[in-house]
Design a protein with these regions (language model features):
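Gram-positive cell-envelope targeting signals
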Residues: 1-47
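Substrate-binding cleft of extracellular glycoside hydrolase catalytic domains
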Residues: 48-176
Length: 184
């Protein structure tokens, strides 16, 4: 069985975080929207699309609906284990469908091997369960927390291997009929 890292927090940590969560979420959402708006004006992009995950908490989609033209929703991270599903993914997809907001999805990859990519492919397909996200299915290859590097993958030296992982994911999603890309 392939295992991915587990992240846990104590109840005390969660209580502290809750007090700051709403304020920090508002700041982060404002910054993200500002960056998106700057990108739009610089590159003449015609759509405002935001990235959301359980880190954004319980989103009031009725308020966001009029400000976005699309959403990219994190559906999970790592291997095909329910504990690594994004806790808000199903709700976020349902809300976008209810309100007619075009959305795509992404999985944050922790893959170190081809077998782990296969597990992440299965994770993605399980979470989609027949949905058809019009903004595509994305393979997030960032290493924001340093997991890949701390486990021996170097983005500069192992570029060919990481490219193979991306190709493996894209080919599997294409075979299932999804528009697919790499989110990095």
């Amino acid at each position: 069985m392939i295992k991915s890292p587990k992240f846990t927090h104590s109840k005390k940590d969660n209580n502290k975080a809750q007090g700051r969560s709403a304020h920090l979420t508002a700041i982060v959402v404002s910054l993200v929207l500002s960056i998106i708006m700057i990108t739009i004006s610089v590159f003449n992009v015609s759509a405002v699309v935001i990235d959301v995950s359980s880190h954004d908490g319980l989103i009031d989609w009725n308020r966001i609906e009029e400000h976005v033209e699309g959403v990219i929703i994190r559906i999970g991270y790592g291997n095909d284990i329910e504990g690594q599903d994004d806790k808000q993914a199903i709700r976020n997809m349902n809300e976008c469908e209810r309100l007619g907001i075009p959305y795509g999805v992404y999985i944050y990859s922790y893959a170190l091997t081809s077998d782990e990519v296969t597990s992440e492919i299965n994770h993605t397909l399980r979470m989609l369960q027949g949905r058809s996200p019009v903004r595509g299915v994305w393979f997030d290859m960032e290493d924001a927390d340093g997991y890949k590097e701390s486990n021996g993958l170097d983005v500069y030296k192992d570029g060919e291997l990481l490219t193979d992982f991306c190709i493996q994911f894209i080919e599997a999603m294409d075979k299932e009929g999804y528009k697919t890309g790499v989110y990095a």
